Amino acid sequence: MVWFQCDDCGENLKKPRLPRHMSMCTATKFSCIDCGNMFGQVSVHYHNQCITEAEKYGPMVRSNGESSKQKHDFDINAELFNSQWFCSLCNATMTCEQDYFAHVYGKKHQEKANEVADMDYSKQQSEHPAVDKNNLTQQPDLDIYVGLSNDYPWFCSLCDINATSEQTLLAHANGKKHRVKVERFDAEQQKRQSTQHSTVDKKDYSKQQIEVDINVGLSNCYPWFCSLCNVKATCQQNLLSHANGRKHRENVELFDATQQQQLEKTTVDKKDTTVNASDGNSEQKKVDLLVSSGVANGYSQAHKKRKLETCDETWKREVVQAEEAKGGGEQKSESKKAKKQDKEKKRKKDKKQTKSDSDFEHDKEDIKQLLVAYSKEELVNLIYKTAEKGSRLISAILESADRDIAQRNIFVRGFGWDTTQENLKTAFESYGEIEECSVVMDKDTGRGKGYGFVMFKTRKGAREALKRPEKRMYNRIVVCNLASEKPGKAGKEQDMAEPVNIDLTKMANQSEAVLPGIELGRGHVLEKMHHQQQQTMDMFGQNMPFYGYSHQFPGFDPMYGALSGNQMLAGLPNYGMFGSGMMTNQGSMLPPPNHLGMAGQYFGDGEQAWHQR
């Protein structure tokens, strides 16, 4: 079988594998491993001369010395004769091909072949002298993997080639074409790096030479403009881009140059003035010398006098300028001090005037007489108009309002009988600091009556609590009002009713117990009639709510309890203990809505219903 090597990827191939390899690789030439001849894609199929040698020896060494599969440091076929099975190194003959190859790959033959290779290497070194490694310019190793993909799909971006597997891609990377392109790529990169370094060095050198403040003449806020170039911009970014331009930089350089020249001139002038002021006598001597030289040269005396006068005048002017320059700073400081003193004097005068005005005060009795003539509404309007924020009048009004307990004390009603002072305090602490908190208790039962008082430390807390008078407290609706405020007169008139003559004889058909006529005031029941009334009310399944807890029998209807608490039959009077108003409807079977609602709401606890009306 003939063996070929691909010129592009360097892979060793048998003849039947050539068509498949051609479809995968872009190689156009193949070399025979035995004879070393080059063939194209078509002529390869007609090469059949090396069939016997390839079948005998397998893939042999190419003419340029590269092996196909294994690369040995020495030639194991050294000193072998192909005609006979004989080894000249070991001086041994073999009878067949198998013995021949077994001897060639043996240890003894390999050791002798290594010795021969070492001898040849020493001869080459003796013929060619050693070269210093330091003088050599070592070429950098090429990175063959440049342009190769790490994952599927396998391709080479440098050569623009696709591969079916990773092995074929690596074989392509070892080929000549890929190596040439990698060398070109490395050379281009080195050129780019060198040019970049040169440009960076030039830029740094230019920056070191000239350091210009680009922000000179730029506005810090809207409107955006450049005073040096007399240019306007729509935004800050456009202004900064203008500052980086060439024209603006040139104008900034000119501005800096003019400033430096002015500074140099001022320094030179100062030096000249100091020298002229200190060395005035020397200048006079120079003038005398000039005059004598002029006389020697034949100038007229009048001309000489003019020169002397001009020199004296200039010298005097320079001396005066130097003195003014020295004393200018002192004069400015003195003028500032004088201005400050004048301002202080004016302030003192104003204070004296205000003191004199304050000394003139009216008598308090006169003010009282004036205020008596005003009504309450007029006084309120006058104070409201004259008072201003931060004034003493407002502060005095607020302090007096905070001291007044009536402005800070709140009356709370509607909570349960089991509420304590701690519960009430925690419910109202969110509005402000509390000074006192009390719950009104019943002396007989020792339970709360359902109302209490909360006193805040400041008026602000009370105001915040009264913004919403109705609040939810422990699943109950609580009503808040100022303690000084009382219910309206209409309610009082209804509450202050005359005693009612209660007669329960009409209920004899329903109960055997008969109550004698007794006059009862509002909210009072005689202890003697407690047992008799309880017997009459037990038939309806409910005790009187005033006496505390009630008992319900199975199948009880709350409507009957509501009727028993107010009026059961036509003509019966109202007891006046379950509501604030009196009943006048003698012919109706149902009580008014307010009494019906109270009885139905507090059916389980009559005493609590009494306090929650």
UniProtKB/Swiss-Prot annotation:
Transmembrane segments: none annotated. It comes from the Eukaryota. GO terms for cellular component: nucleus. This is UBP1-associated proteins 1C. Residues 408-485 form the RRM domain. Residues 322-344 have a biased composition (Basic and acidic residues). It comes from Arabidopsis thaliana (Mouse-ear cress). InterPro entries: LYAR, Matrin/U1-like-C_Znf_C2H2, Nucleotide-bd_a/b_plait_sf, RBD_domain_sf, RRM_dom, Znf_C2H2_LYAR, Znf_C2H2_sf, Znf_C2H2_type. A zinc finger (Matrin-type) spans 85-115, 154-184, 224-254. May regulate the turnover of mRNAs in the nucleus. Residues 322-360 are annotated as: Disordered.
